[in-house]
């Protein structure tokens, strides 16, 4: 197993203390992300709201994954763009925990249609920093708090 995949697995499992940097968490609600990770969420929100599937797909690595609830996994920017093609809709993302170690990291959070409304679901974003220092999404997995009809 290559070291990047192993690092991503450890981060996703919350074993970041073993890698030398603990996840930051808050029992009282959302946390403030470092600007470079906050950009990932604000860009995601903007692309989603605008219905810009091409821009949304560019937030992912070339071989990125989306693991949508109740559907097969989607891999690669072209497939991600196809998955997200459609009209925009309101989206607000907030972070509950994050970690960064070298060029890998994650964000765990919740989502709702509007800021300040109760979360409708939760998400995890696994991230990798590219050669230009920009954080890109390797995998995006979400689930809803209730089953959707």
Cite the ranges covered by each PLM segment.
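Short, low-complexity N-terminal intrinsically disordered segments enriched in polar/charged residues
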Residues: 4-5, 11-62, 148-149
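Solvent-exposed loop/turn segments at secondary-structure junctions
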Residues: 53, 71-74, 112-114, 142-146
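Surface-exposed, charged secondary-structure patches
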Residues: 79-120
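Hydrophobic pocket/interface hotspot
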Residues: 44, 56-57, 64, 76, ...
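A short gly/proline-enriched turn/hairpin at secondary-structure junctions
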Residues: 59, 63-74, 86-87
């Amino acid at each position: 197993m290559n070291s990047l995949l192993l690092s991503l697995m450890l981060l996703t499992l919350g074993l970041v203390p073993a890698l030398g940097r603990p996840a930051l968490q808050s029992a009282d609600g959302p946390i403030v992300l470092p600007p470079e990770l906050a950009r990932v969420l604000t860009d995601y929100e903007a692309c989603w709201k605008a219905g810009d599937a091409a821009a949304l797909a560019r937030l992912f690595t070339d071989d990125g994954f989306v693991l949508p609830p109740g559907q097969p996994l989607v891999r690669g920017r072209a497939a991600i763009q196809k998955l997200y093609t459609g009209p925009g809709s309101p989206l607000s993302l907030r972070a509950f925990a994050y970690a960064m170690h070298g060029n890998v990291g994650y964000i765990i959070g919740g989502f709702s249609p509007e800021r300040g409304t109760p979360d409708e679901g939760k998400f995890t974003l696994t991230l990798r920093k590219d050669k230009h220092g920009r954080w890109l999404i390797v995998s995006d997995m979400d689930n809803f708090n209730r089953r959707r009809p």
